[in-house]
Amino acid sequence: MSNTKQAPKVGFVSLGCPKNLVDSERILTQLRTEGYDVVPSYDDAEVVVVNTCGFIDSAVQESLEAIGEALAENGKVIVTGCLGAKENQIREIHPKVLEITGPHAYEEVLGHVHKYVEKPTHNPFTSLVPAQGVKLTPRHYAYLKISEGCNHRCTFCIIPSMRGDLVSRPIGEVLAEAKRLKEAGVKEILVISQDTSAYGVDVKHRTGFYDGMPVKTSMVALCEELAKLGMWVRLHYVYPYPHVDDVIPLMRDGKVLPYLDIPLQHASPRILKLMKRPGTVERTLERIQKWREICPEITLRSTFIVGFPGETEEEFQMLLDFIDKAELDRVGCFKYSPVEGAKANELPDPVPEEVQEERFQRFMELQQQVSIRKLARKVGKEMLVLIDEVDEEGATGRSAADAPEIDGLVYLNGETGLKPGDMVKVRIDEADEYDLWASLID
């Protein structure tokens, strides 16, 4: 009979965006390394960690509900993440929470776990922690966070008050992590941060070192080095700064996926100014045209806000005109929602909810027509697809134009012999508003 003491269990709940997911992965990796058994439930857990989101009101509500559920089911709860920056708000509703920390407070979270759950002396799990750490994504893709915080002060956003100003990770550290992911079988890396294009600004783009070689701390240099690893490299949260133009040739040459996620937010100069967002419509359209001339295969994704305080019908029409002219491939749209602490809340002339809804519907109808046009042009074309899921009906994957969770899918009906992580060549047979259907090419 074994007298090995069972590892203490820590429950874990992760909410919010991919950047928060990466924070969760880091905490989980350390907990596993120290010998804790991390479980996705409250049953038998000696304490529960809830990594929260606090960006918009609906996310705050979801986080508060998750904390409440953990308290009801378990009773011992440690809170971290963006909402943790608003400790008073949490304590007011959930006074029995044990400890609260803000975002990326990894060491503090671990210290709190040690306080309430004895640190294992015998560690049966250390040898089971993979070199790339614990990942919450499927094995074939992973998020690579290159910085924390943001230097922008957009009036609708409170991220800087939660996560602070931009702090870039050392480029050698980022590239070493990417290499470990490659060695673990990852086929696609999704580069994320609050502002990927600002990578290195805080350290004046100083030279770092990777494998003994000097590398400049910049987005372009990072992309050039990541390209050497031979994975799909997808760029998210890229502001339209001039130096972004330097990445487009890398996309044309197949070194980085021809995909840019650029949160433009609006097209009216006045609304953009009220939002404290960079860029002008004319210049943005010019650059999009230039990018497409250099790299015809480029996929452009963006997000927009409708119903921002003071938005007139004329200004909303400017946004619709931009959507029609720009023909962006993938678009997300949000109705403006006041976020506690955001400067935009102080702006006059809030747009009534029914007007917001009506504009949202008009926006999405137009974008759907754009998407139908764009995807119809892909029928008959050949492309590579990365398989995400396989079931009894067939396989589902994504092309270079599709990021996980937010973009379209490629369906391969009847292809049950494939497995997640397979990279296959297909011919597109059909298209609808957002997705494609394809056949394997032998």
Swiss-Prot record:
It is an enzyme of class 2 (transferase). GO terms for molecular function: 4 iron, 4 sulfur cluster binding; aspartic acid methylthiotransferase activity; metal ion binding; protein methylthiotransferase activity. Residues 8-118 form the MTTase N-terminal domain. It is found in: Cytoplasm. The keyword Iron-sulfur applies. [4Fe-4S] cluster 1 binds at C17, C53, C82. GO terms for cellular component: cytosol. It catalyses: L-aspartate(89)-[ribosomal protein uS12]-hydrogen + (sulfur carrier)-SH + AH2 + 2 S-adenosyl-L-methionine = 3-methylsulfanyl-L-aspartate(89)-[ribosomal protein uS12]-hydrogen + (sulfur carrier)-H + 5'-deoxyadenosine + L-methionine + A + S-adenosyl-L-homocysteine + 2 H(+). Keywords: 4Fe-4S, Cytoplasm, Iron, Iron-sulfur, Metal-binding, S-adenosyl-L-methionine, Transferase. Its cofactor is [4Fe-4S] cluster. Residues 376-442 form the TRAM domain. Disulfide bonds: none annotated. Gene3D superfamilies: Methylthiotransferase, N-terminal domain, Nucleic acid-binding proteins, tm_1862 like domain. [4Fe-4S] cluster 2 binds at C150, C154, C157. SMART domains: Elp3. Its EC number is 2.8.4.4. Its main location: cytoplasm. The keyword Transferase applies. SUPFAM superfamilies: Radical SAM enzymes. Binds 2 [4Fe-4S] clusters. One cluster is coordinated with 3 cysteines and an exchangeable S-adenosyl-L-methionine. Pfam families: Radical_SAM, TRAM_2, UPF0004. It comes from the Bacteria. Catalyzes the methylthiolation of an aspartic acid residue of ribosomal protein uS12. Belongs to the methylthiotransferase family. RimO subfamily. NCBIfam families: 30S ribosomal protein S12 methylthiotransferase RimO, MiaB/RimO family radical SAM methylthiotransferase. This is Ribosomal protein uS12 methylthiotransferase RimO. It comes from Aeromonas hydrophila subsp. hydrophila (strain ATCC 7966 / DSM 30187 / BCRC 13018 / CCUG 14551 / JCM 1027 / KCTC 2358 / NCIMB 9240 / NCTC 8049).
